[in-house]
């Protein structure tokens, strides 16, 4: 996890990097279908919404759910967005002291 953004546009040009987890092209039945397990989406959204680098973009279907695919909104996504809007400011400090734990403020 500590190298998730290493050698990426997010690292090199964060002001130009729009980060997203899913979009209308990647949902089931679409041309670029990719499967991201529902249990992992809150973790993935945490990484793009709570970190300083990049411009996060939240997929409508993850926020409101996708009725035709019987998919519910992502648990705690609204809370993550609220946390970002209220508390995400100032320079970020990473704490990568342990190989299995990622921390940042």
What spans do the regions from the language model cover?
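Active-site-proximal helices and loops of the catalytic beta/alpha 8
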Residues: 1-105
């Amino acid at each position: 996890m500590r190298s998730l953004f290493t050698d990426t546009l997010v690292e090199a040009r964060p002001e130009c990097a729009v980060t997203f987890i899913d979009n209308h092209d990647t949902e089931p039945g679409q041309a670029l279908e990719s499967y991201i397990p529902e249990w992992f989406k809150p973790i993935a959204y945490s990484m793009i919404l709570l970190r300083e680098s990049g411009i996060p973009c939240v997929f409508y279907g993850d926020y409101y759910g996708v009725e035709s695919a019987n998919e519910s909104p992502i648990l705690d996504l609204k809370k993550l967005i609220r946390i970002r809007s209220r508390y995400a400011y100032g320079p970020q400090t990473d704490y990568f002291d342990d190989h299995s734990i990622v921390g940042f403020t």
